[in-house]
Amino acid sequence: MLGPAVLGLSLWALLHPGTGAPLCLSQQLRMKGDYVLGGLFPLGEAEEAGLRSRTRPSSPVCTRFSSNGLLWALAMKMAVEEINNKSDLLPGLRLGYDLFDTCSEPVVAMKPSLMFLAKAGSRDIAAYCNYTQYQPRVLAVIGPHSSELAMVTGKFFSFFLMPQVSYGASMELLSARETFPSFFRTVPSDRVQLTAAAELLQEFGWNWVAALGSDDEYGRQGLSIFSALAAARGICIAHEGLVPLPRADDSRLGKVQDVLHQVNQSSVQVVLLFASVHAAHALFNYSISSRLSPKVWVASEAWLTSDLVMGLPGMAQMGTVLGFLQRGAQLHEFPQYVKTHLALATDPAFCSALGEREQGLEEDVVGQRCPQCDCITLQNVSAGLNHHQTFSVYAAVYSVAQALHNTLQCNASGCPAQDPVKPWQLLENMYNLTFHVGGLPLRFDSSGNVDMEYDLKLWVWQGSVPRLHDVGRFNGSLRTERLKIRWHTSDNQKPVSRCSRQCQEGQVRRVKGFHSCCYDCVDCEAGSYRQNPDDIACTFCGQDEWSPERSTRCFRRRSRFLAWGEPAVLLLLLLLSLALGLVLAALGLFVHHRDSPLVQASGGPLACFGLVCLGLVCLSVLLFPGQPSPARCLAQQPLSHLPLTGCLSTLFLQAAEIFVESELPLSWADRLSGCLRGPWAWLVVLLAMLVEVALCTWYLVAFPPEVVTDWHMLPTEALVHCRTRSWVSFGLAHATNATLAFLCFLGTFLVRSQPGCYNRARGLTFAMLAYFITWVSFVPLLANVQVVLRPAVQMGALLLCVLGILAAFHLPRCYLLMRQPGLNTPEFFLGGGPGDAQGQNDGNTGNQGKHE
């Protein structure tokens, strides 16, 4: 604890700053303790010329000052002092620290690393077969900041299994436990940061980007990881290049020019720059001078907060800068801590007392730690007081303290006395360590990484230096606040960076060239659809589905058949009503006048049977509309053909009788006429119907019609219909009827009618003509009409056939019965003279009269 006098001096120094006297900050970078922690911080930067001209293994001179490095060192100092003042973490023990400057150069970081590994109380690193009992000067190391340095120092510390906790090295390679078994860090690895960057590109629809990295291990590995992440998300890298690290001469300027030329050639509007600070500075320095068009820059954490890059003149013209910074707990007391220690560093009495207390730390070996730190003021470091990585340093110290607490098995009363803890013993308790810092729970995973959230930062220019504004967050998934983002475009519209335009709904990509992001948009045809926006081929609908052109989904097909409510069916039902009404009317008249010469000349009971059959033909039409079923399909043809056969067989008997009476000799006519009337006539009808039954049975057994669903006939519907399996068998089912009609026509076409008598042959001739015209027209019409309308065609053919027979044969007789009853005489219909009334019952007399 600081004494009252010191506190008073510090208060006086804060009230009277800027005396111009040198500070003693460099003497505050070391403190003794029971266990000492080493620290590697970029307190300064070495001159490039000095590094290139180095010919002897001497230490380079670090002349330039790094304010962030000093603040991070003070954060470690504050954390150690807090732990020493607490009674719950390491009671009774005191931590010390030994902080060194790395100059951000591996060659400079080597010397303090060797010093840390020297045996406690000496300057030497002795060679042993077994280092299990080896006690180095420090128990663990905090740092370094950069991955480049951690790659070098990590090999040293890993050999001795000395825990090393970096507060800024984020390279994924450092997670390899085989190579770096003692490496830990309080920042997420680059993979997490690059995953967030890839999610950002995907969020804004940027799939045509350039990816640049610094020409070092950090940049090369970052580009390798990003390439894999981008490919998995459908992001195309138009150009991938390395930015050379700057040197004192201009030998690498041409390479920077080539990189920028390639970026311009690729016409990208978004560039991922995963580079170190110096590489980013060199790239932007040349970009500004060459007037590179503004772009969206996705920054790596390494240069996003760099004053060196932010302060470049003209940097505001480079476009929009977005990047991710890790989120940690706020260290509210840290700014006051820095102010207090800067004030103490101006007090000669405090500095003198500090020098006496810290003697014996071998200054002659390490030299003055940070001479440039003794010439600063609060204004030099005020900009970085709230730097995001300050918390990482603070957390790194607490992680080591918690591991030491676990190793020593400390409790509220103290830590049990035991031999000094070796680094490898501490390391065993570092794995999967859980600790709390500032109320935030942290845990090292098996690779030594911590899981921390990222804030999405945007550069917002206020004057000559930008400020970082939060515009989103990443904790495994990205959330952005788009309304807060100010784009560099004139209308503040989000820039577009795509090789090809976004395909419209129902279009898929046809890739051209080598990049999957460069493509033509092709419409999906009917019957296919685009399932996902990134599809390169249309997905076909299932057979029970359909889709229009340029569709994004399929629709269920509805069943299509000849429904009852369709206009064609309604029209046919009207025709059915007409035909059935005429049949019933004719049947009623014939039954009522069944004993009249007209009805007897028309066949008597056979004529009534024929009309009943015509009525059944009309009713069979009702089997065709409606949803098809197996029973309907099987019944349609037999139930329409058999009644028609019965009707045609009665007409055939009429035609045969007329032919016999008119064309054959009288002796033959007398014998045959008896066979064409009475029981023998019914036998002919039965025989004809049995033949039709046989044909229909063969048709149903050999080639039964079946209900089928055709998914391809109609574009949007599933056609359900009765499929005829054999058109030959279908035609043979009509053979009996066609034969009867043909014989009727032949028997009546050339018959001479008797003058003064009713011409019975003419009605039969025209009835058969109507039959043939109907069914001959039916064949080509059925072959060319849509399948769904085929039942309607057959319905129409049946009804027209019935109407034709009625109109030609039955209706004229009905007219005579109703309008000219005086002609309903035996003489007019049977051919006898006016006084020969008995001739109607005498077959021979009747036949003689006809021939006369």
From Swiss-Prot:
Q: What is the effect of changing residue 540 to L?
A: Reduces the response to monellin
> In the record, what terms sit under GO molecular function?
G protein-coupled receptor activity; taste receptor activity
Tell me where in or outside the cell this protein is found: Cell membrane
Check the record and name the InterPro entries matching this protein. ANF_lig-bd_rcpt, GPCR_3, GPCR_3_9-Cys_dom, GPCR_3_9-Cys_sf, GPCR_3_C, GPCR_3_Ca_sens_rcpt-rel, GPCR_3_CS, Peripla_BP_I
Mutagenesis / variant outcome for changing residue 537 to T/S/E/V: Abolished the response to brazzein
Function of this protein? Putative taste receptor. TAS1R1/TAS1R3 responds to the umami taste stimulus (the taste of monosodium glutamate). TAS1R2/TAS1R3 recognizes diverse natural and synthetic sweeteners. TAS1R3 is essential for the recognition and response to the disaccharide trehalose. Sequence differences within and between species can significantly influence the selectivity and specificity of taste responses.
This protein is called what?
A: Taste receptor type 1 member 3
Protein source organism: Homo sapiens
Recorded name of the encoding gene = TAS1R3
